């Protein structure tokens, strides 16, 4: 048999396999519940009504349970997937999950950039990642990932891209090493990636973390392992004496604090804003305290403070090419050893695809949603 015919036969066999033997099992929802979103989730077994023969078939390797996923189930997130009847459901439904990493199982003959075995992530949110398998009509809706572990691949679209764009897309940095950024929530996964990306660009970072008994131990990890230039407590962040006497010595005489990254809100936000130099920029990408942003009026009038929101999902919709560029550059930083994933923040939950019952799968996801204070990631065992 010729090489061409062999490839065509293999492609046909792979498509046939995807239609007949693959068991599609997904976490779906058709309604929302702002009080207990786990009540709207169901495990659904089905064969896709369309697309499996002419589409790219993907096997899920891992997906995180992100706050945005939970907010979608609650019905309070601005970005929501369309509810459809493509999954053989009685009523229009959506598959939960925005982020994850997949392995290509099969491709139609029209696809030239992907092959079975390739690792990919979705280009956009609302992909429906909480599933054993997915189909995708267009190869342009996927980003190929090479050379990183599944933990990194499964989180690069949100945490990795957020950190990279916060550091790189808004400020013209001086490469001489006098520029600073300040951020709260310094122990968060995004903040740990921010400090590493900044260090690779010769940017200094001042990371603010909550007061705690083991402050020195945590600060040492953030500085030595994740590259923060200096870690301070929220108490120090709010002290006038610290700001006047200690901080100038930390920053140095020629320092310019050009960027403040806020994911907390409330007083913490106001206090990091005070550390900005003239014409500094505040970017807000979260609000963990659930307190409104409060800024001293004088920062706007006399220091020219600028304050903007940041939403990586909207950035990706507005400029898909920049999303692809961002992912590729973040992956390159990982491969070059300039940044590492904060894997200690991740709690792995194993989904035994071949042995777990529907009830066990639902309980696994429910536990992941309800367990707070850690990043839960579901790893599919095949």
UniProtKB/Swiss-Prot annotation:
A biological-process GO annotation: fatty acid biosynthetic process
Active-site residues from the entry: 77
Reported function: Catalyzes the NADPH-dependent reduction of trans-2-enoyl thioesters in mitochondrial fatty acid synthesis (fatty acid synthesis type II). Fatty acid chain elongation in mitochondria uses acyl carrier protein (ACP) as an acyl group carrier, but the enzyme accepts both ACP and CoA thioesters as substrates in vitro. Required for respiration and the maintenance of the mitochondrial compartment.
Cited Pfam families: ADH_N
InterPro entries per record: ADH-like_N (IPR013154), GroES-like_sf (IPR011032), Mito_Enoyl-ACP_Reductase (IPR051034), NAD(P)-bd_dom_sf (IPR036291)
Subcellular location per the Swiss-Prot or TrEMBL entry: Mitochondrion matrix
Annotated residues for binding of NADP(+): 159, 187-190, 210-212, 285-288, 310-312, 375
This protein's GO CC annotations: mitochondrial matrix
Organism from which the protein derives: Kluyveromyces lactis (strain ATCC 8585 / CBS 2359 / DSM 70799 / NBRC 1267 / NRRL Y-1140 / WM37)
Recorded family membership: Belongs to the zinc-containing alcohol dehydrogenase family. Quinone oxidoreductase subfamily.
GO molecular function: enoyl-[acyl-carrier-protein] reductase (NADPH) activity
Assembly information from the UniProt record: Homodimer.
Transit peptide recorded as keyword: yes
Keywords: Fatty acid biosynthesis, Fatty acid metabolism, Lipid biosynthesis, Lipid metabolism, Mitochondrion, NADP, Oxidoreductase, Transit peptide
Root EC class: oxidoreductase
Organism domain of life: Eukaryota
Protein name per the record: Enoyl-[acyl-carrier-protein] reductase, mitochondrial
EC number: 1.3.1.104
Catalytic reaction(s) noted: a 2,3-saturated acyl-[ACP] + NADP(+) = a (2E)-enoyl-[ACP] + NADPH + H(+)
CDD domains per record: ETR
Presequence positions on this chain: 1-17
């Amino acid at each position: 048999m010729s090489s061409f015919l062999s490839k065509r036969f293999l492609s046909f066999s792979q498509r046939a396999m995807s239609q007949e033997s693959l068991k599609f099992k997904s976490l779906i929802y058709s309604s929302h519940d702002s009080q207990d979103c786990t009540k709207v989730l169901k495990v659904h077994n089905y064969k896709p009504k369309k697309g499996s023969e002419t589409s790219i078939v993907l096997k899920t390797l891992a997906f995180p349970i992100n706050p945005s996923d939970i907010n979608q189930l609650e019905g309070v997130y601005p970005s929501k997937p369309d509810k459809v009847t493509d999954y053989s459901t009685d009523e229009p439904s959506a598959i939960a999950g925005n982020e994850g990493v997949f392995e290509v199982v099969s491709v139609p003959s029209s696809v030239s950039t992907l092959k079975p075995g390739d690792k990919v992530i979705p280009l956009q949110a609302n992909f429906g990642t909480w599933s054993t398998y997915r189909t995708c009509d267009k190869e342009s809706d996927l980003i190929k990932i090479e050379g990183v572990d599944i933990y990194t691949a499964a989180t690069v679209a949100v945490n990795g891209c957020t950190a990279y764009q916060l550091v790189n897309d808004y400020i013209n940095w001086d490469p001489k090493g006098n520029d600073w950024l300040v951020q709260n929530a310094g122990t968060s996964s995004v903040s740990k990636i921010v400090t590493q990306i900044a260090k690779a660009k010769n940017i200094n970072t001042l990371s603010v973390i909550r007061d705690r008994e083991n402050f020195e131990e945590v600060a040492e990890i953030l500085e030595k392992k994740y590259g923060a230039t200096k870690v301070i407590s929220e108490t120090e962040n709010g002290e006038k004496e610290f700001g006047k006497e200690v901080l100038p010595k930390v920053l140095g005489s020629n320092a310019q604090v050009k960027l403040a990254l806020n994911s907390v809100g409330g007083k913490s936000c106001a206090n990091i804003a005070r550390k900005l130099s003239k014409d500094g920029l505040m970017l807000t990408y979260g609000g963990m305290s659930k307190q409104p942003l409060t800024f001293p009026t004088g920062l706007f009038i006399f220091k020219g403070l600028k304050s903007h929101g940041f939403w990586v999902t909207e950035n990706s919709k507005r400029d898909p090419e920049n999303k692809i560029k961002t992912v590729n550059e973040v992956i390159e930083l990982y491969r070059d050893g300039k940044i590492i994933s904060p894997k200690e923040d991740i709690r792995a939950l194993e989904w035994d695809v071949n042995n777990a019952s529907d009830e066990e799968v639902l309980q696994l996801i429910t536990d992941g949603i309800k367990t707070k204070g850690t990043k839960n990631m579901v790893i599919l065992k095949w």
